[in-house]
């Protein structure tokens, strides 16, 4: 008798949730690098705090604040509760959301319900998700149908070679994946965001994307949640390869390198973005929006209100950061820049 691959995938998705809620899954020594930068403080700011404008446009959608709920989960029964609570919070706050990988939804019809959030979030920017390792041009019709089914506005393609290498039976053949990415991005009919999962996109990877018809890049740098660490907990029950769990391009470095290599491509900064100050620094360094994922997991298990509370504090801190450096809007913030400490 053969095992059901869909059921196995759903089980792994639930294990990911459990590990993220109960184990130490952040990088233990590697940091995002944002501590090396300071946002300029202006004691003579000429802004009115209550008039500071955080709104922006991303992938053709208007956001009340430059914040996305990052990709987390899908497929398990609990995933549906988490995703609906996250989406409802995004609807209340006027921000966007990335879904977890829809591979399980494509493989198993029963998993589709965990991704369907439009009932509670009819107006949000909603970004679907698929893995680069699994991406094939032949998938375009089925993938487009999956995006249509959930009412997505775009597609995130996540590249995760280190995570896959740590995963039991991971998809470790990435040969030809850049060409497939560019082919699908040109054919799918949705704006495509290339993203990492928390080990970072740096200069070498960005150089490979020149001319590729992607709409944005989520640098998803190192310093927050380590998926190489998570997969080792899932596979072994502990961290058997600690050096690999601490490997990646720190978020601030990733943001700087990709911005320099691809100056016209909109960037998402994620990976260890934990505070409004982190977000302000990332935006001042050239990100169009920021994304936050794992800090919202426990609140999302609890309630919509818990997610809204966490995000509102995050957004309020970001608002004060703009006010304190004399920036009335996000364009002005980018003009302020940051100071790198010696």
UniProtKB/Swiss-Prot annotation:
| Cofactor names | FMN; NADPH; Mg(2+)
Cite the Gene3D superfamilies for this sequence: Aldolase class I
List of residues binding FMN: 71-73, 101, 129, 195, 225, 272-274, 293-294
Task: Give GO BP annotations, semicolon-separated.
Answer: isoprenoid biosynthetic process
Recorded protein name is: Isopentenyl-diphosphate delta-isomerase
Q: What class of enzyme is it?
A: isomerase
Give the protein's biological function.
Involved in the biosynthesis of isoprenoids. Catalyzes the 1,3-allylic rearrangement of the homoallylic substrate isopentenyl (IPP) to its allylic isomer, dimethylallyl diphosphate (DMAPP).
What's one GO MF term for it?
Answer: magnesium ion binding
Cell location: Cytoplasm
- Which species is this record about? Mycolicibacterium vanbaalenii (strain DSM 7251 / JCM 13017 / BCRC 16820 / KCTC 9966 / NRRL B-24157 / PYR-1)
């Amino acid at each position: 008798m053969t095992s059901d691959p869909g059921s196995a995938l759903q089980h792994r998705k639930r294990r990911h949730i459990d590990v993220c809620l109960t184990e130490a899954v952040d990088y233990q020594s590697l940091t995002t690098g944002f501590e090396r930068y300071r946002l300029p403080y202006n004691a003579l700011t000429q802004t009115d705090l209550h008039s500071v404008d955080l709104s922006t446009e991303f992938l053709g959608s208007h956001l009340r604040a430059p914040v996305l709920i990052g990709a987390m989960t899908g497929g398990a029964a609990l995933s549906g509760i988490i995703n609906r609570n996250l989406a409802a919070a995004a609807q209340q706050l006027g921000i966007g959301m990335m879904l977890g990988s829809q591979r399980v939804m494509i493989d198993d019809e029963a998993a589709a319900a965990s991704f369907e959030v439009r009932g509670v979030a009819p107006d949000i920017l909603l970004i679907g998700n698929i893995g680069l390792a699994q991406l094939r041009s032949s998938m375009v019709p089925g993938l487009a149908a999956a995006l249509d089914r959930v009412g997505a506005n775009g597609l995130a393609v996540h590249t995760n070679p280190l995570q896959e290498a740590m995963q039991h039976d991971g998809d470790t053949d990435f040969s030809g994946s850049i060409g497939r990415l560019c082919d699908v991005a040109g054919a799918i009919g949705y704006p495509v965001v290339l993203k990492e999962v928390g080990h970072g996109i740096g200069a070498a990877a960005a150089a490979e994307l020149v001319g590729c018809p992607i709409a944005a890049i989520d640098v998803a740098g190192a310093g927050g949640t380590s998926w190489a660490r998570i997969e080792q907990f899932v596979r072994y029950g502990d961290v058997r390869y600690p050096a690999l769990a601490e490997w990646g391009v720190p978020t601030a470095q990733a943001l700087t390198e990709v911005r320099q290599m691809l100056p016209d491509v909109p960037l998402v900064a994620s990976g260890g973005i934990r505070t409004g100050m982190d977000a302000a620094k990332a935006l001042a360094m050239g990100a169009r929006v920021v994304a936050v994922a794992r800090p919202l997991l426990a609140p999302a298990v609890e309630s919509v209100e818990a997610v809204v509370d966490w995000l509102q504090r995050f957004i309020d801190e970001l608002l004060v950061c703009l006010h304190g450096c004399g920036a009335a809007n996000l364009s002005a913030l980018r003009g302020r820049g940051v100071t790198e400490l010696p």
